[in-house]
Structure formats: C-alpha cells, structure tokens
Design a protein with these regions (language model features):
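Short connector loops at helix/strand junctions that flank enzyme active sites
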Residues: 16-20, 26-28, 40-42, 47, ...
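Acidic, metal-coordinating catalytic segment for phosphate/diphosphate chemistry
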Residues: 1-23
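Generic beta-strand structural signal
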Residues: 25-26, 84
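Conserved Nudix-box catalytic region and its N-terminal flanking loop in Nudix hydrolases
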Residues: 26-68
Length: 157
C-alpha cells in the first residue's frame, strides 16, 4: 500500500477510507426505505444512509442521515452490519433502529419515502449491494427471531 510521506520531515499524509452510516428502521413489521433523488443510483431504493461527518459518532450519523433523507426520527437498537469495501475505500455501517414517528416524506435527497413489508421490497431496484445484503440478513434473522451483528469484506474479483 502506497503512503505519501514528506522526504524532508517524514510527515505521513494519510488518505483514509470514508465511512458510510445508515439505519434499517422498523415500524410495525415494516422497513423504511427511500428512493434516491441524487446520484449515484438516482431513482433506486435504499436504506437511509450517507457519509459520516466530522465530530459525530456512528450512531449520531445514522440518526442524522435517517432524518436528512426521510424527515423522520429513529432510535438505534443495535449495530447490525458492517462491510469493508477496500476497492472504493469505504466502510459501510448499518444499525437496526426503531422508527419513532411516521412523519416521513420526500426530501432533497429522496424523491419518495415509504414503509415496505418484506414481500413488497423491490429487489431489482435496490441501489447498493450493502443495502441488499443488510435486507437479506434481516429477513434471515427475522425468520429465527435472532438478530446478530455481521461483519463482511466485499472485494472486487
């Protein structure tokens, strides 16, 4: 791995991965999803998620992104999935969360916001592989009523 270092003072100039945080928000057996109104993947469905900001925790970022993308408030239940994506220098972290209200709706970032029952999920219109995997894990865990944290590396082959 290449590092940029000053030859005179040996200071290392780090280029670090970006962290994406999000939430699988639940309300009465339904999952909150947003149709992206911005690129990349405009017009496809996702869980509320986005890049972490400075001076916030992972949980704060997931709650903020949920509000920014849906207009609704959430409360974190537990860390749920974490994906390392070294080929794009990102880490994606999703939490299970309770949706605290149904005051959701379109935002600048989302053209549509909707609660989906599991059998209503539009699998061919999911924006990102990490969102799809998180939803698949949720369905598996729901069937056995045991929700576990998963960490996975996704590498291009």
């Amino acid at each position: 791995m290449k590092r940029y270092c000053c030859k005179e003072c040996n200071t290392i100039f780090y280029t670090n991965p970006n962290i994406v945080v999000g939430a699988l928000c639940l309300r009465n057996e339904s999952i909150l999803m947003a149709k992206r109104n911005i690129n990349p993947r405009k017009g496809l469905w996702t869980l509320p998620a986005g890049f972490m900001e400075n001076a916030e925790t992972l949980q704060e970022g997931a709650i903020r992104e949920t509000f920014e993308e849906t207009g609704s408030k959430a409360e974190i239940i537990m860390p749920y999935t974490m994906f390392s994506l070294p080929h794009i220098n990102q880490v994606h972290m999703f939490y299970l969360a309770d949706l605290l209200d149904e005051n959701f709706g379109p935002t600048v970032e989302s053209s549509e916001v909707k609660l989906f029952q599991i059998d209503e999920i539009l699998w061919d219109e999911i924006a990102f592989p990490t969102v799809k995997k998180t939803l698949e894990y949720y369905i598996e865990d729901k069937e056995i009523n045991k929700f576990i944290f998963r960490e996975e590396d996704i590498k291009l082959r």
